[in-house]
């Protein structure tokens, strides 16, 4: 089956796995998905992820979800910029997610990064998703 929004598909898989209290979830691999997972890992929203390569040339990302005292660390995860409606933000208009308790993930000319890192580097970009 063809997926029109691979990043949105990954976020939905994570949201569904958290709803079912799963410890791991897998998704087809791509560089953008891996970069977003790098940011999520650095910010403490997931434990880790590994890339699993198969004999047929395809690979998947195995994501280990993080829970704190039985409650998921990720309370809310949402796609902002979608294929039908891209959302771009300048460095001055990068939002503070949940009054600074959450993060916004942006795709910038300097790579995929969290909102606070984009402010430090004084760069804007595509507002991919927000996590709280």
From Swiss-Prot:
It comes from the Bacteria. InterPro entries: Ribosomal_uS8, Ribosomal_uS8_CS, Ribosomal_uS8_sf. One of its GO terms (cellular component) is ribosome. Keywords: Ribonucleoprotein, Ribosomal protein, RNA-binding, rRNA-binding. GO terms for biological process: translation. Signal peptide: none annotated. GO terms for molecular function: rRNA binding; structural constituent of ribosome. One of the primary rRNA binding proteins, it binds directly to 16S rRNA central domain where it helps coordinate assembly of the platform of the 30S subunit. Belongs to the universal ribosomal protein uS8 family. Part of the 30S ribosomal subunit. Contacts proteins S5 and S12. This is Small ribosomal subunit protein uS8. It comes from Chelativorans sp. (strain BNC1). The lineage of its organism: Bacteria, Pseudomonadati, Pseudomonadota, Alphaproteobacteria, Hyphomicrobiales.
């Amino acid at each position: 089956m063809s997926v029109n929004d691979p990043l949105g598909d990954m976020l939905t898989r994570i949201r569904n796995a958290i709803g079912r209290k799963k410890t791991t979830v897998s998704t087809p691999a791509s560089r953008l998905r891996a970069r977003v997972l790098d940011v999520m890992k650095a910010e403490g929203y997931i434990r880790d992820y590994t890339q699993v390569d198969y004999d047929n040339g395809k690979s998947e990302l195995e994501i280990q979800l993080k829970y704190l005292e039985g409650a998921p660390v990720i309370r809310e995860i949402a796609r902002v910029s979608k294929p039908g409606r891209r959302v771009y933000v300048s460095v001055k208009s990068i939002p503070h997610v949940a009054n600074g308790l959450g993060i916004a993930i942006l795709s910038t000319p300097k790579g995929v990064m969290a909102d606070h890192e984009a402010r430090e580097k004084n760069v804007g970009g595509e507002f991919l998703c927000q996590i709280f």
